[in-house]
């Protein structure tokens, strides 16, 4: 159950980051103003996902050592890189992919230890 909560915290955090990206996509040229920004569905989705992710994360910390749990959030870097590359068409250079591979190795090692 704890691993499922950890995965949920990761996914909610990633969804929050993706929603933030969508929220600011239209703000590249000029900021629309606070009231217009607050009407963004994407911004509210980001706040909801990040808030819920925080609550789930607190439950994870009750049940798992922080030295194991926190590095597992490294999966967020992997997921966000994939979304950036394939959804937002952002370039990812070979060094970045190497870093992602190293993160995956580290998460795998810690997962075996837990």
Swiss-Prot record:
Query: Function of this protein?
Result: Translocates 4-amino-4-deoxy-L-arabinose-phosphoundecaprenol (alpha-L-Ara4N-phosphoundecaprenol) from the cytoplasmic to the periplasmic side of the inner membrane.
Q: HAMAP family in the record, alphabetically?
A: Flippase_ArnE
**Name by which UniProt lists this protein:** Probable 4-amino-4-deoxy-L-arabinose-phosphoundecaprenol flippase subunit ArnE
InterPro entries (alphabetical): EamA_dom, Flippase_ArnE, Small_drug/metabolite_transptr
Q: Give Gene Ontology CC terms.
A: plasma membrane
Q: Which domain of life is it from?
A: Bacteria
Question: Pathway involvement?
Answer: Bacterial outer membrane biogenesis; lipopolysaccharide biosynthesis
Query: What's the main place this protein lives?
Result: membrane
Which locations, inside or outside the cell, does it occupy? Cell inner membrane
Q: Which family does it belong to?
A: Belongs to the ArnE family.
Question: Which residues span the membrane?
Answer: 41-61, 64-84, 91-111
Q: Which GO terms describe its molecular function?
A: carbohydrate derivative transmembrane transporter activity
NCBIfam families in the cross-refs: PRK15051.1
What keywords appear on the UniProt entry? Cell inner membrane, Cell membrane, Lipid A biosynthesis, Lipid biosynthesis, Lipid metabolism, Lipopolysaccharide biosynthesis, Membrane, Transmembrane, Transmembrane helix, Transport
Q: Which gene encodes it?
A: arnE
GO biological process annotations for this chain's record?
A: lipid A biosynthetic process; lipopolysaccharide biosynthetic process
Kindly give the membrane topology term recorded for this protein: Multi-pass membrane protein
Assembly, in brief, is:
Heterodimer of ArnE and ArnF.
């Amino acid at each position: 159950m704890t691993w499922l909560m950890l995965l949920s915290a990761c996914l909610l955090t990633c969804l929050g980051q993706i929603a933030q990206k969508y929220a600011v996509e239209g703000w590249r040229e000029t900021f629309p103003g606070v009231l217009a920004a607050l009407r963004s569905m994407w911004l509210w989705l980001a706040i909801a996902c990040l808030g819920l992710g925080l609550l789930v994360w607190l439950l994870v910390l009750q049940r798992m050592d922080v030295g194991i749990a926190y590095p597992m959030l490294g999966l967020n870097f992997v997921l966000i890189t994939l979304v950036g590359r394939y959804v937002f068409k952002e370039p990812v250079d070979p060094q970045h992919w190497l870093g992602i591979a190293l993160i995956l190795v580290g998460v795998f090692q810690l997962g075996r230890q837990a």
